[in-house]
């Protein structure tokens, strides 16, 4: 078997029997996590024609009975050949025309999937997008690592002045349309894919736009179906963070920590590829006519609230206690949590500015 991915949580292998391939995913910690994912896949495929065709079939599942992984939970899934969206974007030879076709087709299909979600809804008062956002914010605030970033009133990122995250999240509540969405929870679901990230979208045929979906996120007990779509728009930010293709600079370690510069380390063509699909790294897609033409105003705001949630969750999920300094003068460094924290600041400023003009 070929190892494809290995982490503290999961190991993923590619298995070959004769001329056929399959994928085996093993839970390294809790078997419950893999069975939660199995149950989610089964539920999605059972209740949705979209997921029935998009998610590969599970061919076996259970507890491994012998060998190194004895006692571990697993499932085996049909192998889907091809490139992921992230791999296509990171290929400098990918044609812009192909990316435009991908963008058009994938937007239509992914938006359709979240707008037609008919999964069982939850109606408890505390189950809302507002509560999810404030829960993630609370988790960040509990990490002493971010105290200085939270406590200063003004930040400067790439020569633009911003307030801190807490200011913008509090400001969201001042807009009528947001308050209305906050007060509603009839669109919240307890079943969803929740993970339309570019690494989970596979294109089986070269230069074709038909795609498959893998790795739904079974950790959510409830969420807005639009979180799945937000995860798609989070791809550019996530990939930049995951592949360490960024550099943060500041001269403020001896003073007030308030001025930062973020530089992308991707090759120019790769940046162009990502921008074709996702606009720029700071999530400034608010004037994307193709996106707006496929979403009502209400749905567009839901998407952005979920992207806010996605970014905040990203800070928590990718938190690092250590800062990796690139220069001896401690002016240039990398830290995934700080990178996402700063990107979240910029997104929230753009979002609140958009609301001021359109509320």
Model-derived features: positions:
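A glycine-centered beta->alpha junction motif in the catalytic cores
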Residues: 73-96, 219, 308-332
């Amino acid at each position: 078997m070929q190892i494809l991915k290995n982490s503290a949580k999961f190991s993923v292998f590619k298995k070959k029997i004769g001329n056929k391939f399959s994928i085996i995913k093993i839970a390294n910690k809790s078997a419950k996590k893999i069975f939660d994912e199995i149950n989610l896949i089964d539920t999605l495929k059972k209740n949705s024609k979209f997921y029935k065709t998009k998610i590969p079939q599970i061919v076996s599942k259970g507890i491994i009975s012998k060998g190194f992984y004895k006692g571990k939970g697993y499932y085996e899934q049909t192998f889907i050949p091809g490139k992921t969206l992230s791999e296509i974007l990171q290929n400098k030879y990918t044609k812009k025309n192909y990316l435009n076709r991908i963008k058009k087709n994938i937007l239509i299909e992914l938006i359709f999937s979240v707008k037609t979600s008919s999964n069982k809804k939850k109606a408890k008062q505390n189950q809302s997008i507002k509560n999810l956002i404030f829960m993630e914010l609370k988790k960040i605030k509990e990490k002493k690592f971010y105290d200085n970033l939270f406590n200063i009133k003004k930040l400067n990122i790439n020569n633009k002045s911003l307030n801190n995250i807490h200011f913008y999240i509090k400001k969201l509540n001042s807009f009528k349309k947001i308050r209305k969405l906050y007060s509603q929870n009839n669109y919240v679901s307890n079943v969803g894919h929740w993970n339309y990230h570019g690494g989970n979208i596979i294109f089986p045929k070269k230069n074709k736009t038909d795609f498959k979906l893998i790795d739904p996120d079974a950790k959510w007990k409830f969420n807005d179906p639009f979180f799945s779509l937000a995860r798609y728009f989070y791809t550019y930010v996530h990939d930049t963070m995951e592949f360490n293709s960024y550099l943060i600079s500041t001269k403020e370690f001896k003073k007030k920590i308030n001025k930062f510069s973020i530089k992308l380390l991707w090759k120019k063509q790769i940046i162009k590829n990502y921008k074709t699909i996702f606009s720029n790294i700071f999530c400034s897609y608010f004037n994307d006519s193709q996106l707006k033409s496929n979403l009502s105003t209400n749905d567009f705001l839901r998407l952005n609230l979920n992207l806010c949630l996605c970014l905040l969750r990203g800070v928590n999920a990718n938190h690092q206690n250590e800062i990796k300094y690139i220069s001896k003068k401690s002016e240039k460094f990398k830290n995934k949590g700080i990178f996402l924290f700063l990107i979240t600041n910029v997104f929230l400023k753009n979002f609140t500015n958009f609301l001021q003009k359109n509320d």
